[in-house]
Amino acid sequence: MRWTAIAVTAPTQEAANEVCSTLPSALQESTVLLAVPDATSLKVGSGAATLNALLTVAEELSARAGFSTLSAEPLRDARVLVLHSGASARGGSPNPCLPQALTSLPTVGTVPGETEAVSMAEWAVRTASRLFDDMPPGLVVCSTDSLLLIPSTVALQPDVLREVAGAVVAVPQSLEVAVEHGVCAPAAAGSDLLGSIVYRGSREQLATLASPDGTYPVRQGAVVARGW
């Protein structure tokens, strides 16, 4: 995947810069890497952070394309990745003073000659790059707070986004995990179209959402949207 731009969001400029510093080995030279702090000191959600990141990306790409004002033209063929990083690590982290995005994983880079450990943020970039390798121009939003482990043979099929505007990534989980997270509910029985996401639903609410093998499609921190 050749990303046009990658925007890293964080509560502060310093935190965003630190996460960006772990990413160069996962990028192509042509990728524009942007550190985007939250627009306010108040706590903001991922939706507001995404909008702020998209504005920053649009401004940067417009300027690089020679526009003196904000223009959507540079986005038409752009593939943009937004990475959300939180303020601090979750409980149990081996690095409690660091954002979760900077947590080192027990693995090394896959680039020949590379020996440095991979951070959660870099893992998110590499996973998104492989998973959405054939996507058309559009937007991918990923969290760096969870470790998404997907078989190397799994990837988004190009024809999927020709039929729908976007898609979410969900993985099968047990009921014990599902009741603590968001479970994808289909628009209709047997449909692959997303109707809603049931967040921290009761066992009774989730009873009808179980797959034939008894697992539940739990939403992970990755969303893809086609076109601009």
What residue ranges belong to the model's regions?
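Unchanged
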Residues: M1-W228
